[in-house]
Structures are given as C-alpha cells and as structure tokens.
Amino acid sequence: MRLCLIPRNTGTPQRVLPPVVWSTPSRKKPVLSARNSMMFGHLSPMRIPHLRGKFNLQLPSLDEQVIPARLPKTEVRAEEPKEATEVKDQVETQEQEDNKRGPCSNGEAASTSRPLETQGNLTSSWYNPRPLEGNVHLKSLTEKNQTDKAQVHAVSFYSKGHGVASSHSPAGGILPFGRPDSLPTVLPAPVPGCSLWPEKAALKVLGKDYLPSSPGLLMVGEDMQPKDPAALGSSRSSPPKAAGHRSHKRKLSGPPLQLQPTPPLQLRWDRDEGPPPAKLPCLSPEALLVGQASQREGHLQQGNMHKNMRVLSRTSKFRRLRQLLRRRKKRRQGRCGGSRL
C-alpha cells in the first residue's frame, strides 16, 4: 500500500497549514468542477461562415506588350543666321584696316583694343534680339584681344575705368579712347577721401617726364622730379576745388588759440592760517536766562518720570508677591482640611 497526502482547502485561514488526511490513493480520474471546466475542458471548434460574394480579379494578359513612348529628338540647326555673318564681315574689315596701318605703339594698342571690344559687345547686344541657333565662334576677336592683353597689361588695367585727361582735350579734359594726344597727358585731381594708388600706377607707366596735377603728388615729388614749364602750366590749370581744399587745410594747421589763465582766488586771510571761526548769533542776557530755566525744567521732569516708574515697578512687584503668598496659603489649608477628614 502507498500512502499519499491529500490537502483540504476548505476553510483554511492564511498562514495556517491545512489538516493532513491519510488515505489510500484512488484510481479514479479527478472530476473537474464547473468553475474549472472553462480552463481545463475541451474547447468547442469555432465555425467561420463562408463568403457569399464573389470577386473577379482581372490580370493583364501576357500577349499584350508594353511599348514605352519615345521622346522626339530635337533637331539642332547648325545654319548660321544672317546676323552672325554680318558681324563676321565687320570684324574682317576692321582687321584688314588694322593690318594696313601697321604695328602701333603701346598707348595706341591700349586705345584701339578697347573700341574693338566695345563694338563687338554693341553688335552682339543690338543685333541679337533672340538667342542664336548653333554655336558662333568669333575666333578673330578672341585672338586679337589675347594679343592686346599680353602686350599692354599695365596700361589696359589703368584705362579700364578712367579716361586720359589733358589740357587741350575736349569735354572737360577727357579724351575719347583711340585718339592719342600730341601733348603730354596729365591725370585729373583725386577726389578727397580716395586712394592715390591708380595715379602711382599711371606714373610708372607714363614715365618720369610727366607730372600729375594733384596737389598731394606735386608736394611729394618736388625733390624727386625736375620742374618743367608744361608741368607748371598743368598744375596752374588744376580745378579750383583742390586749391580751396588745400587753403582750408592751411587755415586749420595754424597755431591754436591761447586760453586766458583764470585769476587766482582772493583770500581774506593768509595761506598759512586757517579761516576764521563762524560767528554765533548775538543773544541778550534775558534770553540766555530764559533758555537755561527751560533746560532745568526739562531735566526735572525727566527725573520725576524715572522716579515714578521705579515706584510703580516696586508696587507691582509687591502686589504680585502678595497674591502668590495668598494662593499658597489657600492650597495648604485645603490640603490640611482634606487630610483631617
């Protein structure tokens, strides 16, 4: 026989072991209760309803072939319009005229290279209202510009944004490019507040024989360069603004105004001695007596107040002591009467 323990779970409190019953093991299967039937019992199969509707799927057939659309190729027209041919003819005629003239100096090269570029730009802007079809290469223009830039680099740098001025030139002393001046050229006066670097570059290019008309460079270069009559004439013909500006500077550079010294303070006493003492107001003897009497009365009143406070404090202390003694006596009498009873 085999013994096993079967615990009883009915009515067992917490933290208390259930009573043990010794009995023989039964071969019967344990009966599931109604509470545990949902957990351990067999689940009934779920029935899924059939779909009543029908779906027709349309698949593409394999016979049909998808042909991608081809983009139309844009035809490039290489034909040059009439406007481009006219530009080429003008450039060729200018080259022939330049070759007939022969080699020119540096100043003329700088003056002639600029109008070619401007004419090319003007023709391209005026005669091209719409973009040209095809590539039009103006080889002659580019070759000419490259040779001119290689020969005269310094002069072309200065002549890009400034005209060359002279005393005998029209339109305010500025010559148009392409016409060399017979007399020595003179640069214009600088605007106040601007740098003199372009004028120095022009001096290096033109040489030591030519002097600028600006007053600043004339003052600096008096010792280094000789005085020529042409240079003196050009300096006299300088604009009136620069002369006025120079005279204004001279006025400012004069001796400063001298301030008048302030006179010293007049003291009524000597410096070694200090100031005299302050004068007190004059009082009559009657007023002095009245003031002394009022001070005495004030002191007396303060003394009387202190005395009264002391007396009051003493009386209050004595009263409190008397009250305490009376209370103690009453307590003692009450205790003695209670013990006797």
Swiss-Prot record:
Compositionally biased intervals (Polar residues): 108-127
Source taxon at top rank: Eukaryota
Family annotation (Pfam families): POM121
UniProt biased composition (Basic residues): 243-252
Residues that span the membrane, as ranges: none
Ranges of biased composition (kind: Basic and acidic residues): 72-101
Region described as Disordered: spans on this chain: 70-131, 218-279
Family, similarity comment: Belongs to the UPF0607 family.
Descriptive protein name: Putative UPF0607 protein ENSP00000383144
